[in-house]
Amino acid sequence: QPFGLALVIAPWNFPFLLALGPVVSAITAGCSVVVRPSNDAKYSAKLLHDLIAQYMDPDVCRVVGAGHPGDGIDTMNAVLDQKEFDVVFFTGSSRVGRIVAKKCAEHLTPCVLELGGKNPVIVSEDCGNVDLAAKQCVWGRMLNCGQQCVSPDYVLVHESIEKEFTEKCEKWVKTFF
């Protein structure tokens, strides 16, 4: 059975992907959706608002907050205080995730939190392709300026291949950028 009304609180990085992915999942599961884009991506939020308003039934999907006149809701806390949501999906920082979880707990609203974290990469001495490992580490860290929840935060490299790995990373940074 569908949960009912889902609230999707989207982050500023990847503003369309990380808003629309949960929206599609919720609608596919039979839920209607309210999307709360980030204030830090106001132009993307405005476009998302305009497109959803133009192409979606407002009883199925609508956008609130992020400075859109007429919504009457301009902060995340105000949105969460509405008590109308049956499930909340939040993508963002651990700090804000705690706030969302606390607000949801007040109303016994189930929530899904996709939070940033520490993402180590381990390159062992028996790594079959140090060049490929370096390439993937550099690409993963630099993609979207490193502003993604799955971006490598640090690399633990076995000392026997540390020099080779570092040289390969330098090569890939120069190649990509």
Label for each model-derived stretch:
Residues 9, 67, 91, 140:
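Conserved residues at the C-terminal ends of beta-strands
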Residues 35, 63, 90-92, 111-113:
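General beta-strand structural signal in soluble alpha/beta enzymes
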Residues 63-89:
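A structured beta-alpha segment of the ubiquitous adenosine-cofactor-binding alpha/beta core
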Residues 35-51, 64-73, 124-128:
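ATP-dependent adenylate-forming carboxylate-activation enzymes
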Residues 1-55, 59, 108:
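Conserved small-residue-rich beta-alpha loop and adjacent elements
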